[in-house]
Amino acid sequence: MQPSSPNATNYLADNIQISSANLSQTEMVVGRDSADYTAMHSINVGVGNSFLRGDTDIPQESGHSFETPSNMSFTAGQWDTESLPPVDTPDALNKAAGRIRSLLRRMDHETVAYEDMQRNLHYAARVLEAVFIDESREGCNGNCKNLNCSRHSHGRDDQQQDNNNSNRSCSLQEASPGGAGAGVTPGADNQDSIESRTKGVSQAPQTHSGPTGPPSNTSSETIAQPAPKLQPALETVRESVMEESPSKDPGDKGPPPPASTSTLTSQTTTSSSATAEPSAKAAESQAGSAGSSGSCSNPAAVHRQRRLRTPTWARSMSTNKTRLADEDDELSEVQPDAVPPEVREWLASTFTRQMATSRRKSDEKPKFRSVAHAIRAGIFVDRMYRRVSSSALTAFPPDVVRLLKNLDDWTFDVFALTEAASGQVVKYVAYELFNRYGSIHKFKIAPGILEAFLHRVEEGYCRYRNPYHNNLHAVDVMQTIHYCLCNTGLMNWLTDLEIFASLLAALLHDYEHTGTTNNFHVMSGSETALLYNDRAVLENHHASASFRLLREDEYNILSHLSREEFRELRGLVIEMVLGTDMTNHFQQMKAMRQLLTLQEATIDKQKVLSLVLHCCDISHPAKQWGVHHRWTMLLLEEFFRQGDLEKELGLPFSPLCDRNNTLVAESQICFIDFIVEPSMGVMSDMLELILAPIAPMNKSKPATLVEHETTANSTTNSAIVIPNSGITPSMDKPRDHRTEAKTTAAECLARKSVTGTTASKFNIPKPWLTCLVENKRIWKEQAVKDAEARALATAAEEAAAAAAAEAEESKPETETADGEQSEPAAEPADGAAA
């Protein structure tokens, strides 16, 4: 399903302006650069304010004034990102924050077009990537060589004052010595600090391709002879500036800055005249300074303009003393639980690498004044991405949402789901599970590509219209492996990539199944059997067809994986899919039992996940009776169709494929006794062995619970593998029910002797035990009834055959009697004739 098309009513205007009346708060202008954007509402955002509205995990301050549906006025064209400033400019963060904040609020009312959401999120992500910090917590003594230091902006000695004057104006602009800098108070300087820094950037062309480049009107001659007092400060930029060549006459002036960079809200302009007048004068003075920057002969001004290309939040903004709070105070505003692990790792790796190249040797530990803001931005983008990815596919039907709440249960009914989902079960269940485990976000799967991929997978499963091996079976196996990952704790033993591979393998393990067995392909000499040399014919086809589908760009959900990640995922998926070949069942069980008997067994993850998927593939007899019986009837119907085809081709019937000669109940009892129950037992022991070291020790259970578990285990016929011992009950034939209690007691004693008390052993939930017992009981009752019915049918057939035989025997006797009666009558006639 496609998202709704963009229209003027689907969007929320981010008409937010930040009032600069309060100097203790961050000065930002968040809004559109259009002439129609005049009537705006004000909102005061402090340092600690979050980007998110209504979030309880991020502290928020009062003063927010969000738009209501009545004042939402946005056209579809205004969501374009072409009008936004470059990602490395000072106001890029504010613009991106306003954009995404508006998107978030709009999503609370109506849907937003996916294309607009994608463009704005991409812009916000690039803004975050442009962030880098060049400060440390170490204080400045007023004599450092860093021109970015706040004390250089407000120095009190003559040298510092001259630096201030040279940084704020060019040599062609006349200024009284010592007067300009001394007359500016810290408050006034802070009021126009962002505006003054924006002036230099606004002259460069605004693109999204990265830095706007250094000023092209700076002459190399000017840089060659810097002022002596600025010589130490400009050593770091001399080499890069010398490489530039003049492209303009020094007398030319650059274009005036856009009005958007100095636009103030109506609320700001109508504040107090005493505040507005100095601001206007400062803005005028800075406009003149920026206008004459093209003819600037002062190297400090060149250095200043080069610094303006650095994002505002990445430089020192400590001119306002209220913003010189400790970094720990800023970070304390963000709770650790509010930061997703992937965002935290990204922040740590990114900021650490960039700071390592910019900090001085004397710094012992880098301190980041803007980490808190970056974390908040990262949290916001992360949540927005999750919301977009979860709403990219159209909303799930209410009945589907209700049924998906039981997705974590062993008794999940996929047949009820397919009725509510109109047959599109792969689309809803696969998307739900990928989203629950975070695979969509972690591996950057585009929602549109994921939707197309799931649609093709569903088509592949429905291609041959199989009664059993169809999209329902794929979803059933995928939900079962989800239960094993989630409820047993197996997911804690795996990486994100391995979890994603497990879900993907379960989804694709029978992709494009033909509805026939491997033996049928071999016996009939099909093209698939010839292609794969009669070995795991269908399983090889499932894996090959799946990766052939993933190779197409419009269905490739693995496009953002690295080469190593793709190789690992492909190997794991292929191994798991090939492990579903039933011809390898007993060999697989034997190998795992041998590993479990070792004292210090090292079990490969591929073998573990292959066994888990294999058990999930044959697990329907371990589900509740209603689901299991329905699956059994569907599987037998598929077998019978193969038998009909074999009859047409003149091939012998495969087992259980003859409609007229199949013992359904007996076959299911044997399947449970010899295949399913031993497999589930081995899987349980394997999971308990590998998960025990990473799971907390279970507390001592109540005696009634232990007794209940012992009773439940005693009613099963599973071949239990005892860890760290060689005791394995025989699988040659089902155990006699008369000796079942004795055998179970012996197994319990053996367990206690090897593993100690029951309370100290790590146990996983085994809801299949009761289902297996119940299903076997019902099948046995059904077998008795079937035997009686067959006996009656046999008796009836025998009676009918006897009756037919008697009828055949009585018929010749009647003919003989008639012949004897006709002979005496003929004799008198002969005598009369004589």
Swiss-Prot record:
Q: Where is the composition biased (Basic and acidic residues)?
A: 236-252, 732-741
Return the Low complexity bias intervals.
207-222, 260-301, 823-834
Q: Show the segment(s) annotated as Calmodulin-binding.
A: 364-387
Binding locations of Zn(2+): 473, 509-510, 617
Which superkingdom, per the lineage?
Eukaryota
Region Disordered, residue ranges: 152-338, 720-744, 797-834
Residue stretches of biased makeup (Polar residues) = 313-322
Keywords on record: Behavior, cAMP, cGMP, Hydrolase, Magnesium, Metal-binding, Zinc
What EC designation does it have? 3.1.4.17
Record's function text: Cyclic nucleotide phosphodiesterase with a dual specificity for the second messengers cAMP and cGMP, which are key regulators of many important physiological processes. Required for male fertility and male mating behavior.
Indicate what this protein is called per its UniProt record: Dual specificity calcium/calmodulin-dependent 3',5'-cyclic nucleotide phosphodiesterase 1
- Which organism does this sequence originate in? Drosophila melanogaster
